[in-house]
């Protein structure tokens, strides 16, 4: 398992995680 692959997968994971948190933040009325 190369370091590049790990970094790429981790970046995708962080993007999905932050996107979900952003949606929750919008739902909560940007409090």
From Swiss-Prot:
Residues annotated as signal peptide: none
Induction (UniProt): Produced in the A cells of the islets of Langerhans in response to a drop in blood sugar concentration.
Pfam entry (one): Hormone_2
One of the record's GO molecular function terms: hormone activity
Any one cellular-component term (Gene Ontology): extracellular region
Top-level taxonomic group: Eukaryota
Keywords: Hormone, Secreted
Primary residence: secreted
Subcellular locations according to the entry: Secreted
Known role: Glucagon plays a key role in glucose metabolism and homeostasis. Regulates blood glucose by increasing gluconeogenesis and decreasing glycolysis.
PANTHER family: GLUCAGON (PTHR11418), PRO-GLUCAGON (PTHR11418:SF0)
UniProt family annotation: Belongs to the glucagon family.
Protein name: Glucagon-4
């Amino acid at each position: 398992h190369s370091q590049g692959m790990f970094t790429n997968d981790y970046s995708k994971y962080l993007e999905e995680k932050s996107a979900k948190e952003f949606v929750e933040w919008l739902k909560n009325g940007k409090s």
